Amino acid sequence: MNQEDLWKRFYAVVGGEPQLYALKQIVTYLLNLIADPKASSKDIARVVSSDPALSANVLKIVNSPIIGLRNKVSDLVLAISLLGYNQIRDIALEISVSQALNAKQNAQMMRLWKHSFYCGKISEIIAASLGRMAGEAFTMGLLHDIGKILLAYANYDAFETSLNNYRYQRGKVLHWQSEQATIGLTHAEIGGLACVRWQLPDLFYRVIWYHHVPPAGNSKSEEIYLSQVVHLADTLCWNLNHPSVNSVNPYSGQKPETLLSENLLAEVGLSKGRFQDVLTKVNESLKTTELIFNFMKSSN
């Protein structure tokens, strides 16, 4: 498909200019503040305290059995210091997205959101273990399936058609292959083209476009490196039973070390020993995150 036909197909599928729900302004501001190395717990507490739901959830979690403190905490600054900035980021994103989901599509969209979020977490852990671009890896992992989310919001019938075909195939094809066959574009292509329309840096377009088929070769290039990291994280996410859609999971039940290509692990810079360390950290992180999210739902 040439460039012109690609764009025509894109607009036909998403029904015009690509649009998504917006994160609450406070969450956007908070994410930028957390990314600022000069920001202090007091700065973050000042923003958190302006949102009652966010403040309440931060205090509920820091005082919950999950954290296991002996003494109760009522000071937001102390709570933020104890939980850590990344945990505050996670809570803020969870609240914002949960409030944005509509009731009709809630179950599928929540599954898709959790998969995206967990892929971001795993990408961050992999990149942190390699000492390179952990923050960028989280963002790319979080946004890797933005094409699925955009498609589901803009044209749920097309999203459902590709999903039903994928379910019918029962693991014989991957979801993106089902999309290509039914709607003529994959979610990776939709997400990549949306990034172009939104005038995001080229790195977003390239990593999202290639996250299913990352370029081979050494990972000195940021584009190749992040594509490989997100691909590894996405595969692990499915393997750990956090898929983006409810269907037969072709990756479930397999050992991660046999599922992933040794060449890809080597290219991204992960030895077998370091990969096992990554798996341990991933399991610990996702277990804690799942407990916190479930606690937030049960206590609201």
Which residues are covered by each model-predicted region?
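Short glycine/proline- and charge-enriched loop/turn segments
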Residues: 166-176
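Terminal helices and disordered tails flanking the catalytic cores of nucleotide-processing hydrolases
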Residues: 1-13, 258-300
